[in-house]
């Protein structure tokens, strides 16, 4: 015999839907939970979001404020000096992209890590520690626009 037919929801977990407007005896008749008269008692009687009955709404009473710099921000792709150790000769944004270190955009080289080979590094920006590390290894730093 299957146990599936004996399965039932836990007692008290199921509620019958409220049958609104189906006679006074139901307890939900008469005004059908809408109160007496007025706009909200009518069909389609909702007011739009933010409407305050004709009073100037809060979002129009308060002034605009703030500024977003997102459109003008300079977002640099970050590469550390230690990640340049696998390169030889010249390092450019194109070679960094080909190696999968950056996706696109301007590049900033930071000074974390060690560099033992002399490299010519071309990037849009360098930190002071990155410049020192590259030049200490016998390399050159070139800032590109």
Curated annotation (Swiss-Prot):
Database matches in InterPro entries: Ribosomal_uL15 (IPR030878), Ribosomal_uL15/eL18 (IPR021131), Ribosomal_uL15/eL18_sf (IPR036227), Ribosomal_uL15_bac-type (IPR005749), Ribosomal_uL15_CS (IPR001196)
Gene3D superfamilies for this protein: 3.100.10.10
One of the GO BP terms on file: translation
Keyword Ribosomal protein: yes
Composition bias, Gly residues: 22-32
Keyword Lipoprotein found: no
Highest taxon of the lineage: Bacteria
GO cellular component: a single term: cytosolic large ribosomal subunit
Swiss-Prot/TrEMBL keywords: Ribonucleoprotein, Ribosomal protein, RNA-binding, rRNA-binding
Transmembrane segments: none
Pfam families, alphabetized: Ribosomal_L27A (PF00828)
Record field: compositional bias (Basic residues): 12-21
Disordered: region residues: 1-55
Any one GO molecular-function label of the UniProt entry: rRNA binding
Complex formation: Part of the 50S ribosomal subunit.
Role played: Binds to the 23S rRNA.
Family per record: Belongs to the universal ribosomal protein uL15 family.
Protein name: Large ribosomal subunit protein uL15
């Amino acid at each position: 015999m299957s146990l599936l037919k004996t399965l039932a929801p836990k007692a008290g977990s199921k509620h019958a839907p409220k049958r609104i407007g189906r006679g006074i005896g139901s307890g939900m008749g008469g005004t059908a939970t809408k109160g007496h008269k007025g706009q909200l008692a009518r069909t389609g009687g909702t007011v739009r979001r933010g409407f305050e009955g004709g009073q100037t709404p809060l979002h129009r009473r308060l002034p605009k404020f703030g500024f977003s710099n997102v459109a003008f921000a300079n977002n640099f792709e970050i590469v550390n000096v230690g990640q340049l150790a696998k390169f030889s000769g010249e390092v450019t944004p194109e070679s960094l992209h080909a190696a999968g270190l950056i996706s696109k955009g301007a590049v900033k080289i930071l000074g974390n890590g060690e560099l033992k080979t002399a490299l010519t590094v071309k990037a849009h920006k360098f930190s002071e520690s990155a410049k020192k590390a590259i030049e200490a290894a016998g390399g050159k730093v070139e800032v590109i626009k």
